[in-house]
């Protein structure tokens, strides 16, 4: 027998009553009771979720005996009930340390304004003559650019900042004029990079913004597959690579090819910059003014912060916000007239199908900046807006007495995990679960992760399996073993990431060479940002409702990304999470990063990896910790 209690408000109460009246007897104005099968209960939950809104709050209690009931699930607003499903009769205000973020989002304002300001400059380089001719369908122009638009944008931003401090260039941006950028250093024309490094001499916040401008499509990679270049720098030089080894060729792989040299001067011939657009200048003034007030970065202590190298969380969440915004706005079919300067003529991209010019450059920059700021604001709310694992007896019940000898260790492990739950909120968690085959590690892993979530009450985790084959069948067996539904556990299968991440060096160079050639065709339209985030062969088995969350406005158009994100538990092979650290271009890191940002991580039997793969595994563990995940290694 079960009892339903509805604490719904407004129209949601009537919708809830219609659903529950069809399955149970109403025993009060907001309560129902009935005898029901497990399948029937699952159907009720599914129907309630389908009609749920922010005003919905329904709890279901299983009457176990005359003196005991157990909370089965809650649909909707969990704040209407406590952890046992009881309805509060009074409220008390108190400072709850476990719900205050003292660590992860301290730099939320920096992320927000770094993303918004870099978005204003990220495509400045598209105003060059070669690019404008390339995307214009009425002109049969050369399709190649020696220097990519990101590199030219970087040089233009560097020219704007000059030798100013962060406070000074933000002040100038807040009152920018059409002639604030008159010229910039031209690689291949004015000399070598050693004569004028684009990053080294910038102040800390400007260096972060410049990096985002440079890396908004892809991270710099040395093209070691090209035969006309010096050998790739040694890994030993990694700490000082920006100062010693960095060059335009890391971004623009073809800039030193002989057949490109005749195009260089045209590449640097700039048409009207977005500075000429009153709409762009208005947006820049507004963003810079807010940033100058909100960001208290200019004390002597914080001026010494290296935002690019020492604040990886800030740098990469800013980049994620910028790339997700660029992808979102580039895909829009409707133009935004109020963001277009009436006399501004440069374009940012063309339509993939019709090949016709689509978004004006000033409109595109304003749109991406607008959405980047909103995405960065929404990121801290993402975890709280996603559904967590419902109370599950499989994870909380002790091992039966008859199985204590073989599986009793699970109870001890769960108890230890629960005891460090509060500590792990602030200090993180890395655990190793070692047990022989057949001792129930799979179930124990889930119990441990649920116990670690005791303090916050939010259990969400991803199980990353080794490179053995994961099929839908084995994934569904995993689901049954944990006693979870297809709404609570999603399975990611397919894709070619394994082959690409762990292939040998020769094959990797061959693939990079091929992709470098294909890259050019994608840039012909100026629409690289529309490329897919996820592998086209990836399939995610998830039957839950696609409910709203803080990033819904920017992810709802990507069904597979939504499915990867929404389920409380994800089971996949490890390569589907590896792009968080190994993905270098096209936003491939975004899906995995959002998953790690909103769930803990279980590395289950990573025995298929050799010593050569350990750096990639270590990067994944480091990244998970940086994004706030608790990590458990099971072997």
Predicted segment positions?
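Divalent-cation-assisted or electrostatically stabilized phosphate/pyrophosphate-binding catalytic cores
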Residues: 136-163
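Short basic/glycine-enriched coil/helix segment immediately N-terminal to the Walker B
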Residues: 112-113, 422-427, 559-567, 584-601
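N-terminal accessory nucleic-acid engagement/regulatory domains that precede
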Residues: 1-70, 76, 99-100, 183-399
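Walker A/P-loop
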Residues: 425-449, 605, 609-612, 634
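SF2 helicase catalytic motif II
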Residues: 575-577, 589-623
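Conserved SF1/SF2 helicase motif Ia
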Residues: 448-476, 483-487, 625-630
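A substrate-engagement module of RecA-like helicase motors
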Residues: 479-568, 574-576
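Conserved pre-motif I regulatory segment
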Residues: 113, 387-434
């Amino acid at each position: 027998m079960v009892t339903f209690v509805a604490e719904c408000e407004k129209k949601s109460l009537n919708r809830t009553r219609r659903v529950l009246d069809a399955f149970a007897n109403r025993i009060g104005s907001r309560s129902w009771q009935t005898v029901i099968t497990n399948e029937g209960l699952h159907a009720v939950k599914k129907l309630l979720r389908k009609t749920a809104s922010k005003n919905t709050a329904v709890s279901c209690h299983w009457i176990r005996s005359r003196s005991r009931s157990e909370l089965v699930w809650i649909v909707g607003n969990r704040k209407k009930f406590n952890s046992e499903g009881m309805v509060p009769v009074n409220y008390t205000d108190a400072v709850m340390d476990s719900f205050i973020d003292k660590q992860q989002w301290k730099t939320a304002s920096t992320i927000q304004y770094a993303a918004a300001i870099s978005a204003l400059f990220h495509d400045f380089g598209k105003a060059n003559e070669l690019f404008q001719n390339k995307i214009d369908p009425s002109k049969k122009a050369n399709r190649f650019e020696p220097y990519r638009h990101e590199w030219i944008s970087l040089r233009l931003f560097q020219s704007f900042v000059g030798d100013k401090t962060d406070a000074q260039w933000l002040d100038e941006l807040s009152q920018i004029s059409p002639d604030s950028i008159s010229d910039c250093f031209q690689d291949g024309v004015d000399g070598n990079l050693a004569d004028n490094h684009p990053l080294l001499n910038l102040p800390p916040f400007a260096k972060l913004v410049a990096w985002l401008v440079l890396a908004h499509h892809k991270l710099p990679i040395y093209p070691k597959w090209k035969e006309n270049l010096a050998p790739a720098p040694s890994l030993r030089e990694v700490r000082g690579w920006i100062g010693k080894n960095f060059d335009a060729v890391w971004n623009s792989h073809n800039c030193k090819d002989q057949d490109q040299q005749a195009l260089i001067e045209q590449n640097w011939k700039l048409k009207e910059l977005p500075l000429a657009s009153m709409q762009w200048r208005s947006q820049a003034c507004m963003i810079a003014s807010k940033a100058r007030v909100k960001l208290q970065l200019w004390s002597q202590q914080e001026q010494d912060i290296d935002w690019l190298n020492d604040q990886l969380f800030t740098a990469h969440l800013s980049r994620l916000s910028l790339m997700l915004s660029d992808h979102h706005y580039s895909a829009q079919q409707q133009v935004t007239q109020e963001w277009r300067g009436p006399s501004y003529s440069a374009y940012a991209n063309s339509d993939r199908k019709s090949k016709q010019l689509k978004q004006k450059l000033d409109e595109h920059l304003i749109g991406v900046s607008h959405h980047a700021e909103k995405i960065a604001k929404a990121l801290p709310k993402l975890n709280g807006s996603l559904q967590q694992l419902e109370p599950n007896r499989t994870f909380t019940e002790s091992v039966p007495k008859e199985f204590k000898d073989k599986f009793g260790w699970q109870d001890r492990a769960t108890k230890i995990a629960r005891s460090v739950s509060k500590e792990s909120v602030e200090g993180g968690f890395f655990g190793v679960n070692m047990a022989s085959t057949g001792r129930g590690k799979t179930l124990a892993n889930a119990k441990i992760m649920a116990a670690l979530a005791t303090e916050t009450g939010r259990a969400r985790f991803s199980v990353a399996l080794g490179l053995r084959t994961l099929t839908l069948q084995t994934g569904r067996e995993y689901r049954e073993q944990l006693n979870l539904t297809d709404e609570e556990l999603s399975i990611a299968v397919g894709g070619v990431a394994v082959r690409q991440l762990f292939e040998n060096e020769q094959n990797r160079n061959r693939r990079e060479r091929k992709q470098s050639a294909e890259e050019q065709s994608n840039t012909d339209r100026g629409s690289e940002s529309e490329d897919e985030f996820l592998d086209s062969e990836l399939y995610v088995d998830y039957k839950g409702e696609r409910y709203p969350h803080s990033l819904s406005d920017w992810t709802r158009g990507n069904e597979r990304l939504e499915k990867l994100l929404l389920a409380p538990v994800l089971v996949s092979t490890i390569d589907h999470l590896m792009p968080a650290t190994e993905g270098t271009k096209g936003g491939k890191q975004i899906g995995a990063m959002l998953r790690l940002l909103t769930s803990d991580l279980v590395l289950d039997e990573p025995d298929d990896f050799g010593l050569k793969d350990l750096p990639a595994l270590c990067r994944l563990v480091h990244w998970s910790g940086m994004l706030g995940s608790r990590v458990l290694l099971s072997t």
